[in-house]
């Protein structure tokens, strides 16, 4: 789902809000700053406080909310505001890795980390062209209707499905 942002941010903001390269660069800088704060500061504080499982649920929901907010933003200032829940969703990834590691024998850690890396690689191969095509489909001249936020709706939907799957799996299988 996050590939909706990674592969379409520049196209979306230029198309929807008529941003220029400087504005796109500023927004990407802010994303980098927010991600750095979440990854470098917030995770160390919040994940131990609420636990990894809740961090997964909350993080995935925040990603979902951020995606849907991006999709339906009507003003540039909204995009900057909506970066907050989206970037806060970054608490989910490290928590998910921690939960997976906690539930695997030490002798299987390398294998499970390899599986996780492979899944991330597969999504990095499939996600960008898929999301770019969705953007194209809803913005080209003969589109059935114009909706540049479509990749974010798809990304948000995928994040929501991930949240439900995580909840069902962790509720049934998590030992801690």
Where are these regions (language model features)?
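Short amphipathic helix-loop junctions that connect adjacent transmembrane helices
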Residues: 7-24
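A membrane-interface helix-boundary motif in multi-pass transporters
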Residues: 133-159
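Helix-to-loop junctions at the C-terminal end of transmembrane segments
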Residues: 38-52, 135
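Structural signature of the two symmetry-related core transmembrane helices
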Residues: 54-69
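Helix-loop junctions at membrane interfaces in 12-TM secondary transporters
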Residues: 69-83, 92
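Multi-pass alpha-helical transporter architecture, strongest
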Residues: 153-176
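Loop-to-transmembrane helix entry/capping segments in MFS-fold secondary transporters
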Residues: 21-22, 104-118, 145-148
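Intracellular juxtamembrane helix-capping segments at the cytosolic ends
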Residues: 91-105
């Amino acid at each position: 789902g996050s590939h909706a942002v990674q592969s379409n941010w520049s196209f979306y903001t230029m198309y929807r809000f008529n941003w220029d390269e400087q504005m796109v660069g500023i927004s990407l800088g802010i994303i980098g700053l927010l991600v750095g704060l979440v990854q470098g500061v917030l995770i160390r504080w919040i994940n131990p406080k609420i636990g990894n499982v809740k961090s997964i649920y909350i993080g995935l929901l925040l990603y979902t909310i951020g995606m849907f907010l991006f999709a339906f933003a009507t003003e540039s200032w909204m995009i900057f505001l909506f970066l907050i829940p989206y970037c806060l969703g970054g608490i989910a990834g490290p928590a998910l890795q921690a939960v997976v590691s906690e539930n695997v024998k030490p002798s299987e850690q390398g294998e499970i980390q390899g599986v996780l890396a492979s899944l991330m690689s597969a999504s990095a191969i499939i996600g960008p062209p898929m999301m770019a095509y969705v953007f194209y489909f809803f913005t080209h001249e003969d589109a059935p209707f114009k909706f540049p936020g479509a990749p974010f709706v798809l990304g948000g939907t995928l994040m929501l499905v991930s949240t439900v799957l995580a909840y069902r799996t962790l509720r049934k299988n998590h030992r801690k």
